[in-house]
Amino acid sequence: MTDEATARLLDRFLGGLGALDPVAVWAHGSLAGGDYREGRSDLDLIAVLEENAFRLSTARALVGLHRRLRAEEPLARKLHCSYLTPATAAGAGRSHLTWAHDGPMRRPVTPVTRCELHTFGRVLHGRPPEGLLPPVPGSELRAFVVRDQKEFWRPAVDKARLWRQDVWIDLGTITHARATATLREGRLITKREALDLLPGLGAPQDVVDDITRRRYEEPAPAAPAWTDRRAERTRSYLGPAIDSLVAAYGTATRA
């Protein structure tokens, strides 16, 4: 069930796209998967526009739309959207115009996102992913997950300053649990399922409890001593855990 402020933002966003007559608008992530928490979860969207609608003036109009929403709707800071066309949707490695983290950028629509769209994507407008977005082979999904753990998350563990921030604690541990489930069982899991899985993977229980409390309850500000200890405990867990996961699955998923 979508909360009132989220529903209002989505209505305004879809209304703003109306002049471009989008082929489709889809939600993935927590908003589609059933673990959405208003004000805490991101709103992860994909919009497909017709080829002849995509030009420089279109990009400017989209940036203007996001900036207006950001100024008028508090939740808009959480809204991320990548813009594809039917012709560019097939390229998993291709970068697309994206609004995320308060600004425009170009980035790919990853194999994980593509699998989410096919597995539990939510159609907000127009056509479903089938027929527009090619399915992702299991081997491609597994290879991406291993590469993401090895090339992005493992080097990040060594950057101590990052891990004093909630977002790195949350995403680092949850992404690792989700990667483990994908590689072991071939399935995508929600953040709630990832948190349930983490203690069995050896994650520190107090860190898991901290993430759970901040996501699902009303968290109190963390004391500096806990922030430092949490960072150390998370890094001490994730480094060896990622190394073990990559060692176990890296060779099997290598192209």
Residue ranges of predicted features:
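Charged catalytic carboxylate motif
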Residues: 8-12, 61, 175, 233, ...
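Structured mid-to-C-terminal alpha-helical surface segments
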Residues: 187-255
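Catalytic metal-binding acidic patch
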Residues: 29, 33-64, 78-83
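Conserved NTP/Mg2+-binding pocket subregion across the NTase superfamily
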Residues: 63-166, 173, 179
